[in-house]
Design a protein with these regions (language model features):
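Gly/Pro-rich cap/lid or specificity-loop segments adjacent to the active site
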Residues: 1-166, 222, 228-270
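Alpha/beta-hydrolase-fold enzymes
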Residues: 130-224
Length: 270
């Protein structure tokens, strides 16, 4: 996997260390994120790494090289999330190399950015499902309102653990990707509404490990930021006043504004 496995790993230790210890997604901290990534990428370039060679197009070409190497006439593609973008690009570049393509959790062009409006819509979709479940309603008549109330009344610390809203919302955002994790995070909010913030305090701290163990962040800054639009104010999308949750994961794109190198975009047709 180009940029992750093999001889070159696009590791970004300065970014990880800074991100793990951020308390708020303020403009000052977001700018520091961009500076940290810039420093990490500069070190990679000083080691002889050509960062322009680590785009999704190169990834797709690697797959085609492997197909040829194995002598397959056609191959089947099974892709989820980010992988669906690779599958999509592969289908455009090498349509005759594909036998079948199965995709789930589709990530179309532009899909690396989670807008606050879409996240709000998805949270309310969870809320609608909740209201149709008598067992769930017995715990809370409105899980969305529960989340909103809890986020508005968070203590600064709980039993010695700092409870930081921006970090908590970020890890909540990550956990809402899957229904099993969503159920767990809802349980934590339900407990907090009853005065037990231990689960949310743990999640606020656990984001450290989530960031540290997430696949190589430099890979994101050479592939994922292809959806970055310099005309968009990503900082304003993190905590928009009209929505209670916002888009905490947008902090990554907000930091891209402060990179000291141009973003390598892929051809427009992809």
């Amino acid at each position: 996997y180009r940029g992750v496995d093999g001889s070159v790993s696009l590791a970004t230790p300065e970014f990880v260390e800074l991100f793990r210890n951020m308390d708020t997604f303020s403009r000052e901290n977001i700018e520091k994120l961009g500076e940290a990534v810039s420093a990490d990428l500069k070190k990679l370039e000083e080691q002889g790494v050509d960062l322009d060679g680590y785009t999704m197009v190169e990834m797709v070409d690697d797959v085609e090289t492997v197909r040829k190497g194995f002598g397959y006439t056609t191959i089947n593609l099974y892709a989820g999330s980010y992988g669906t973008r690779l599958s999509y690009i592969y289908s455009l570049r090498y349509p005759k190399s594909i036998h079948r393509s199965f995709m789930f959790a589709i990530n179309p062009p532009g899909g690396f950015v989670w807008t606050p409006e879409m996240i709000d819509k998805q949270i309310h979709y969870y809320g609608d499902l909740w209201k149709n479940d008598p067992e769930a309603v017995a715990k809370s008549p409105d899980i969305v309102k529960t989340m909103q109330n809890v986020l508005e009344s968070l203590p600064q610390e709980w039993n010695g653990l700092n409870v930081i809203p921006d970090r908590l919302k970020l890890v909540t955002n990550f956990m809402l990707f899957h229904t099993d994790d969503a159920a767990r995070v809802f349980d934590a909010y339900l407990a907090a509404e009853q005065g037990d913030y231990s689960g949310l305090a743990f999640l606020s701290v656990a984001v450290y490990d989530i960031v540290a163990t997430t696949p190589t962040w430099g890979d994101h800054f050479t592939k994922g930021v292809v959806d970055y639009d310099p005309e968009v104010n990503y900082e304003a999308k993190i905590n928009p006043p009209e929505l209670f949750f916002g888009s905490p994961s947008t902090v990554i794109f907000a930091g891209a504004k402060y990179l000291d190198r141009p973003i390598t975009y892929i051809p427009e047709e992809y």
